Regions:
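Conserved class I S-adenosyl-L-methionine
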Residues: 132-159
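A short acidic, Gly/Pro-enriched loop at the edge of an enzyme's catalytic core
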Residues: 92-104
């Protein structure tokens, strides 16, 4: 979503529609964790994560749009949060630090990837050995979810596509009004996997 959709991302009714706080409760964020959001946009989710991991923790907020990251920095400053690092990624590389992240979340973002294999390679490399990947995706199985079909994802699709890139699907939580919560752990990547060699571009708030 482009920067023109920023107001929609920050709409007052978003919590009642999506129960973001409930999703964050379900994924086990703890003080001191290092976490990341890929496709963080305005920071609606990333800043809520920052409050949960606290001053001893860190949130890497990734996006490919500098304008979105600027809005995120403004929002973080207004919220008094100093544990957020913005990261300008690319469509092939999230540019997250290697092997340092406990949990990476994608909220209705996976379907936007033009090169999902490359992005998942970078995400896999950024996670610690026991790190987790969490996808929130609108339920394709439910025709009542008022989202365009190509913005939805079924559990079967999520399992097949993401597991092919070195992950193992674990719990699937169906407690949200419209979205799956899909939780993956790392699995060994195939010998054909491309080694992540991206640099890190950080902008401290």
């Amino acid at each position: 979503m482009g920067v023109g959709g920023a107001d929609w991302l920050e709409r007052p009714e978003r919590e009642s529609e999506e129960n973001v706080e409930g999703a964050l409760n379900a994924i086990g964020l703890k003080p001191g964790m290092t976490v990341a959001e890929v496709g963080a946009a305005t920071g609606y989710v990333a800043l809520r994560m920052a409050r949960r991991v606290g001053p001893a923790g860190k949130v890497y907020a990734n996006d490919v749009q500098p304008e979105m990251l600027q809005l995120l920095r403004v929002n973080a400053t207004k919220a008094g949060l100093t544990n957020v690092v913005t990261v300008l990624g690319s469509v092939t590389d999230p540019k997250l630090p290697l092997g340092q992240i406990d949990l990476i979340i994608l909220v209705d973002v996976y379907h936007e990837f033009s090169q999902p294999q490359k992005m998942l390679e970078g995400i896999h490399s950024a996670l610690k050995p026991d790190g987790r990947l969490v996808l929130l995706e609108y339920r394709k199985e439910d025709p009542a979810v008022p989202i365009l079909p190509d913005h939805k994802m079924s559990v079967a699709e999520a399992k097949t596509e993401v597991e092919a890139e070195g992950f193992k699907l674990g719990p699937v939580i169906e407690a949200l009004p419209r979205q799956h919560i899909l939780i993956y752990t790392k699995a060994p990547r195939s010998s054909a996997a491309i080694v992540y060699d991206g640099d890190i571009r950080e902008c401290w708030i």
